[in-house]
């Protein structure tokens, strides 16, 4: 009996010593969250005389918190212009926010450029097509390092060093710098000013490009207004500069609990042809309704940018878009270029 008691005591001492060497916790390790979205479309092109259905895009996202940091990755498979499917790393972000200085965040990877109102993924927009300003006048994606500082509940600052505009692998030795200030003067208004500077042409650092971009978001009751202005230039040779400017405005009005109407006007003046390859002025008007239902799961992207509009799980959007160019641009059925075109889109977006 005495021997058995000694054995129990010795086991207890051994267990206590092991517990001192290793912290015992009953907290569960945070799981990896898997989310994503799928997009199906029906398109009509008046000038090209084409129409068809496409299962256009699937995006799968992984989110893993780890203490003060998290990892977010998104793989996107989409159809290109030739109808071939291609998969790319759309986002890959390692982010760290220290507990003792949680107003600072350091992030590295590939991420959405903190500019403007529009984004590249369909669930993050209110209308099923992107503007000319988003496509040409400013970067949509950056690959590099980002520092975010929350100076106050109303003021946020960003600084970014990246490879360049929408490039995953650097095409020259220089780097692109971005600085942004975002201010909330009243709870339903957000104002942002962004400057971008750096070489963007392949194999040379001499042709520096600069961009000044400002954006305004108003989220008031049933109305959302998103607007942006872009002014840019690039040194071409010697002291010569190519310039461009553009503006886009989007208005969304909620007319019922699950129904809204969106309209957008977009103008981009590429008078030197640097961005589009042809000196021209591009304009577009897009109008259409959106029916939406349920709320998508919480994640790194939960709302339309700078608004309280929570991403719906299901959204059915239709739009008619009229495009104009000061030069023949839109190919018709015979291959000839026309100066105007009208397209129609019916898009289903499902977030899972």
Each language-model region and where it sits:
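Outer-membrane beta-barrel pore domains
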Residues: 46-48, 92-96, 110, 119, ...
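Intrinsic disorder/low-complexity segments
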Residues: 5, 15-19, 34, 53, ...
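Short glycine/proline-enriched turns and hinge-like loops at secondary-structure junctions
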Residues: 85-87, 170-174, 206-207, 240-243
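Hydrophobic alpha-helical membrane context
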Residues: 14-15, 69, 276
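Outer membrane beta-barrel
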Residues: 21-166, 173-178, 182-191, 250-262, ...
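Compositionally biased regions
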Residues: 4-8, 12, 19, 191, ...
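N-terminal periplasmic/intermembrane-space "pro-region" immediately following the signal or transit peptide
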Residues: 5-44, 297-304, 347, 352
């Amino acid at each position: 009996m005495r021997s058995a008691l000694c054995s129990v005591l010795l086991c207890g001492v051994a267990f206590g010593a092991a517990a001192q060497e290793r912290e015992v916790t009953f907290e569960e390790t945070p799981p990896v969250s898997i989310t994503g979205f799928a997009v199906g479309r029906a398109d009509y092109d008046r000038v090209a005389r084409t129409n068809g259905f496409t299962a256009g895009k699937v995006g799968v996202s992984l989110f893993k918190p780890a203490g003060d940091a998290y990892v977010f990755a998104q793989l996107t498979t989409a159809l290109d212009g030739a109808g071939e499917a291609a998969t790319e790393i759309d986002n890959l972000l390692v982010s760290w926010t220290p507990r003792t200085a949680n107003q600072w965040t350091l992030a590295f990877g590939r991420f959405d450029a903190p500019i403007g109102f529009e984004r590249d993924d369909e669930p993050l927009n209110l209308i099923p097509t992107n503007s000319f300003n988003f496509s040409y006048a400013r970067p949509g994606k950056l690959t590099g390092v980002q520092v975010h500082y929350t100076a106050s509940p109303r003021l946020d600052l960003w600084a970014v060093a990246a490879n360049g505009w929408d490039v995953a692998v650097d095409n020259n030795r220089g780097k692109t710098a971005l600085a942004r200030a975002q201010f909330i003067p009243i709870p339903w208004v957000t104002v942002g000013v962004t400057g971008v500077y750096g070489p963007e042409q392949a194999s040379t650092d001499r042709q520096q490009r600069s961009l000044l971009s400002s954006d305004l978001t108003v989220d008031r009751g049933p109305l959302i207004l998103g607007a942006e202005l872009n002014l840019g230039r690039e040194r071409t040779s010697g002291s010569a500069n190519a310039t461009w400017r553009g503006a886009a405005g989007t208005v969304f009005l909620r007319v019922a609990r699950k129904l809204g109407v969106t309209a957008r006007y977009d103008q981009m003046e590429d008078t030197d042809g640097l961005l589009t390859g042809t000196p021209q002025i591009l304009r577009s008007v897009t109008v259409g309704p959106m029916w939406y239902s349920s709320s998508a799961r919480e994640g790194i992207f939960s709302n339309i940018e700078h608004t309280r509009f929570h991403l719906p799980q299901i959204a059915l959007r239709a739009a008619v878009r009229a495009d104009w160019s000061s030069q023949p641009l839109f190919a018709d059925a015979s291959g000839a270029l026309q100066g105007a075109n009208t397209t129609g889109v019916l898009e289903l977006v499902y977030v899972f």
